[in-house]
């Protein structure tokens, strides 16, 4: 590993990991070229500078996917058990948060996007195996919920007033697993006919994908159409993929698997990925429902086990 902050990082690892300052990268590549004249690079993962530099010092560059990515995709029994246990704990935190949110809304207490985000964090951090968030929480109310990758700041922070939608997309890193969940909650008691219709269509897509059975030759792009079907009947859609891979106490976005319009992913038992259809009406509201799925065998076919344990 080469990084400018190597002194701060190296103290957290043992001698099995070589960490050096970034300025040593060129020398290391030159030393490598003395005894090695060919190298495999993953074009999706390798910075162009490294490829360019290797070619200039006489190394033959060939291309192949990093084999480590495929080994990570198939979770073993310990990792699967950890995922299930971490989702039980995470689900309890989500339920406590939803109970707190509903109770305080009924009492007309002032709750902002930032307050809600911090409260959810506080519930999660009480878990002994909690190690931090898996990504920065998306906590958006009303118009802010229509921004797919919204990040609340002091300047954009909105109060959760009655009669609009609140979307929170959040996840945690536990020592035994990683979580990623999105829920969309109506604040108040008078959702519009349109909001009820769109929410139902998003929910149908989520549930139908979760319950779908398919053979091993089905691609990610084929499953993607299931999540979009009920929205497309109304001639609307969402501008992102339906799902991404999830690492085991690693990156919450783990490639190369996905469920999206161009995905050529083939699925195998033990893979873990998200299911997150949505709809976003610009500057008005956003709806997304996200669960994590485990690929399993069902009736000589493949299917999904929903790991996320929280009410929709």
Question: Where does each model-flagged region fall?
Answer:
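Active-site neighborhoods and metal-handling regions in enzymes and metal-associated proteins
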Residues: 1-312
């Amino acid at each position: 590993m080469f990084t400018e902050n190597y002194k701060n990082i190296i103290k957290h690892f043992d001698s099995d990991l070589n960490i050096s300052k970034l300025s040593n990268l060129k020398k290391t590549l030159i030393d490598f070229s003395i005894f090695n004249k060919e190298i495999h690079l993953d074009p999706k993962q390798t910075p162009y500078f490294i490829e360019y530099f290797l070619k200039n010092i006489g190394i033959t560059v060939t291309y192949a996917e990093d084999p480590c990515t495929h080994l990570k995709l198939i979770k073993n029994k310990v990792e699967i058990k950890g995922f299930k246990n971490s989702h039980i704990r995470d689900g309890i935190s989500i339920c406590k948060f939803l109970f707190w949110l509903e109770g305080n809304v009924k009492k007309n207490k002032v709750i902002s996007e930032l307050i809600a985000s911090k409260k959810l964090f506080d519930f999660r951090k009480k878990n002994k195996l909690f190690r931090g968030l898996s990504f920065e929480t998306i906590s958006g109310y009303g118009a802010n919920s229509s921004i797919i990758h919204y990040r609340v700041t002091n300047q954009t922070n909105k109060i959760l007033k009655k009669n609009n939608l609140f979307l929170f997309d959040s996840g945690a890193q536990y020592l035994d697993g990683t979580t990623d969940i999105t829920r969309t909650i109506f604040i108040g008691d008078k959702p519009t006919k349109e909001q009820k219709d769109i929410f139902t269509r998003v929910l149908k897509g989520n549930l139908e994908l979760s319950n779908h059975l398919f053979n091993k030759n089905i691609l990610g792009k084929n499953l993607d159409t299931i999540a979009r079907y009920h929205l497309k009947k109304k001639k609307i859609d969402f501008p992102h993929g339906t799902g991404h891979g999830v690492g085991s106490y690693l990156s919450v976005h783990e490639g190369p698997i996905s469920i999206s319009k161009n995905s050529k992913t083939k699925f195998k038992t033990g893979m873990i990925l998200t299911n997150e259809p949505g709809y976003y009406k610009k500057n008005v509201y956003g709806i997304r429902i996200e669960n994590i799925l485990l690929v399993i065998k069902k009736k000589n076919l493949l299917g999904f086990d929903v790991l996320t344990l929280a009410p929709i």
